[in-house]
Amino acid sequence: MQPTNFHDQLKFAWLAGFVDADGCINAQIVSREDYLLKYQVRVSLTVFQSTTRHFILLDIQKILGCGTVRKRNDGMSEFCVVGGTSLQTTLEKLLPYLQLKRAQAKLVLQIIKKLPNTKDPSVLMEAALLADKVGLLTDGKKRTILAENVRECLKKLGHVV
């Protein structure tokens, strides 16, 4: 879903610059005891700013028409879009303009296509492997749950993956 007019193109190019500089496109594997397969792959886009510039994140939310903005306790604010359709639409708009985080965006878009079918053990495993690839491209925290943890759990549950 490409922006069609020049004004929209400028807005999304500006926003992509923000994401490249002060944002994070991420996929993480989350333990979920209430899930049949015990794991979920969660995808998100987050942009951080000092709370003194909180208004910029509100502008981003308005431009995209989705996401949440919150003030943290450490003097920072964050804008976040989590999961599915909203994130897919957002990444598709930003993809032509992303530079540093283009590879992460492409991988997360692949994961999003798999999300509706992750109750299938093999699809969950594919999504987890893609999440590991996203993790290799990010500068964030060390991951505690990897695709190998998902594979081991699925085997214990009697699934061949």
From Swiss-Prot:
Keyword Chloroplast: yes
Location in the cell: Plastid, Chloroplast
Major location category of this protein: plastid
Disulfide bonds: none
E.C. number: 3.1.-.-
Keyword Chloroplast listed: yes
Recorded GO MF terms: endonuclease activity
Keywords assigned by UniProt, alphabetized: Chloroplast, Endonuclease, Hydrolase, Intron homing, Nuclease, Plastid
Pfam families, alphabetized: LAGLIDADG_1 (PF00961)
Gene3D superfamilies: Homing endonucleases
GO biological process assignments: intron homing
GO cellular component: chloroplast
Membrane spanning residue stretches: none
The protein's enzyme class: hydrolase
Summary of the function given for this chain in its UniProt record: Probable endonuclease involved in intron homing.
Family, per entry: Belongs to the LAGLIDADG endonuclease family.
Protein name: DNA endonuclease I-CvuI
Organism expressing this protein natively: Chlorella vulgaris
